[in-house]
């Protein structure tokens, strides 16, 4: 079966032909960078890759050194299995990769999970590895950057770094569970956050449980 391909349409220009204006539209396959770093919650990155593959989105994957260690510790997946979910993969030390340049067009980047170290590196422009550099490119090009920050409790440093990035236009999206959808399994909890992440890119996840506005049906609430 042929896999679906997600295309994004973007208006480029108007041209005058035979006395009338014609709208010229350029389409491109959606491209999203996915980074998995060393915080707990590697399954979030894996599930995002799975959902993006199902949606036909082209993905560019970077797994940090500690991200790879955490992946093996927390999930049943090998690094090779996770990399097989992506369209392209890069080593974290490959500073010459396509995603290190702003001229390589993408629709954005998600770091899931995002460690406190990665958060600090992106906030302060360290650029010491490809995850930092790719995120720096996304920020300077004014593209969508989503950070699934996994840390608790949060220190002043963490909060200030998140505020700094939010002011730059990044979306800080910690993996907060929702209970209005009555999750039954860990997968349900993970899927809720993944759906919220993909919402940021205008992508709909099949079967996502969303708030309907109904509460306490058949019950009196003070």
What are these regions (language model features)?
Residues 26-146, 152-222:
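A cross-family phosphate/adenosyl-ligand binding-site feature
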Residues 13-19, 105:
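Intrinsically disordered, low-complexity serine/threonine-rich segments
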Residues 7, 21-24:
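Short polybasic linear motifs
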Residues 10-13, 27:
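Serine residues within intrinsically disordered or low-complexity segments
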Residues 3-5, 9, 17:
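Short amphipathic, helix-prone segments within low-complexity/disordered or flexible regions
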């Amino acid at each position: 079966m042929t896999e679906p391909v997600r295309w994004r349409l973007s208006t480029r220009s108007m041209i005058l032909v035979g006395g009338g204006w014609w709208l010229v539209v350029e389409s491109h396959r959606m491209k999203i960078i996915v980074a998995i770093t060393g915080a707990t919650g590697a399954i979030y990155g894996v599930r995002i890759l799975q959902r993006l593959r199902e949606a036909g989105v082209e993905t560019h994957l970077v797994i940090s050194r500690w991200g790879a260690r955490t992946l093996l510790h927390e999930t049943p997946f090998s690094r090779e299995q996770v990399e097989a979910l992506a369209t392209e993969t890069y080593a974290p030390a490959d500073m010459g990769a396509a995603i290190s340049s702003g001229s390589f067009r993408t629709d954005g980047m998600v770091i899931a999970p995002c460690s406190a170290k990665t958060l600090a590196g992106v906030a302060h422009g360290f650029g010491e590895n490809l995850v930092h550099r790719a995120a720096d490119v996304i920020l300077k090009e004014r593209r969508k950057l989503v950070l699934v920050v996994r840390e608790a409790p949060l220190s002043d440093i963490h909060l200030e770094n998140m505020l700094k990035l939010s002011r730059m236009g990044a979306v800080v999206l910690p993996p907060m569970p929702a209970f209005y959808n009555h999750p039954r399994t860990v997968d349900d909890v993970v899927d809720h956050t993944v759906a919220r992440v993909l919402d940021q890119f205008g992508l709909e996840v099949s079967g996502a449980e969303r708030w309907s506005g109904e509460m306490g049906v058949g019950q009196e609430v003070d």
